[in-house]
Amino acid sequence: MTDKEITGPPARRLYHPLVETLEKYYAEHGDNHRGLGFRTEEGFEARYRVYLEVIRDAAARQECTLLDVGCGTARLLDLIKALGRSEITYRGVDLSPKLIEAARKKHPEGDFTLGDPFDLEEIWSARPDYVVFGQIFTCRLEMSVAEMTDYMVRMLRLAFTHCRRGIAFNVMSKHVDWERDDLFHVPFDEMADLLQANLNRNYVFRADYGLYEYTVYVYK
């Protein structure tokens, strides 16, 4: 696969249909768990609580910045506010104009950027402490496993290069009752190999929240 197939031309990249699918869910169901592709509200919140736990020493409430890539309607910011985590300075970025518009309506004071992370130098030059990728690597639709893996690795390398402390992201587990062809199931050992080859070996796997997926933390 060439760089152009993944990161250019900007008008149409292999992962853009993922955004279109989420916009369809949102149009049908609105700003709730089903509108963002989740089956239950409980599972939705469990994921986002785990994303936030990438922040080490949270009890100390040290100030930090967090970049939410694929922020959607900013449900992670909803949770941050509900938990009173005022020490977190949040910024969201998304490819969908419709979802960014919804996020801005809910949080008019929020910092949201519309665009593709591969093209937005300004979000990386700010050097966020943490980068969270919420659910953008779980569904591959028509992308092959190789294409999806390449997309994920390129995005993770970009984020890890520019963050100060660490990143969090999730993928579907291989330990499931059955696998769906449109989802991205990654074995633990394969993920470990990818991380060691492209980021580092300072990582944590989280599969303790009752869903058929796992979340990965990678720290500097």
Task: Identify the residue ranges that each predicted region occupies.
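A short SAM/SAH-binding and catalytic strip from SAM-dependent methyltransferases
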Residues: 130-149
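N-terminal, positively charged/glycine-rich alpha-helical extensions of SAM-dependent methyltransferases
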Residues: 1-33
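Short conserved loop adjoining the S-adenosyl-L-methionine
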Residues: 119-125
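Conserved alpha-helix/loop element of class I SAM-dependent methyltransferases that forms part
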Residues: 43-62, 79
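Conserved beta-strand signature within the Rossmann-like core of class I S-adenosyl-L-methionine
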Residues: 163-171
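Short, conserved SAM-binding segment of the class I
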Residues: 151-158, 162
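Class I S-adenosyl-L-methionine
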Residues: 178-220
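Class I SAM-dependent methyltransferase SAM/SAH-binding core
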Residues: 67, 74-119
